[in-house]
Amino acid sequence: MRAIISLLLISAMVFSMIEAVPLEEGLQLFEGERGCLPRNKFCNPSSGPRCCSGLTCKELNIWASKCL
């Protein structure tokens, strides 16, 4: 019985820590991960076929194979 209560308390503590980060901040962190990589001017591979235009990512068209 004590083990179950301890497990519930630990679960509640972990959940409250996860909820401590606001959703908007979490989304901003995720968007930042998809930003431009400075060393090769390409976006993160997880963002798909995109390249950098300034500091933002743009879609590559069928004729473009690299960023200019």
From Swiss-Prot:
GO terms for molecular function: toxin activity. The keyword Disulfide bond applies. It holds the Pfam family Toxin_7. It is found in: Secreted. Disulfide bonds join C36-C52, C43-C57, C51-C67. Residues 1-20 form the signal peptide. Residues 21-34 form a propeptide. It comes from the Eukaryota. Keywords: Disulfide bond, Knottin, Neurotoxin, Secreted, Signal, Toxin. Insect active toxin causing rapid but reversible paralysis in crickets. No activity shown in mammals. Does not show effect on mammalian voltage-gated calcium channels. Belongs to the neurotoxin 01 (U2-agtx) family. This is U2-agatoxin-Ao1x. It comes from Agelena orientalis. The lineage of its organism: Eukaryota, Metazoa, Ecdysozoa, Arthropoda, Chelicerata.
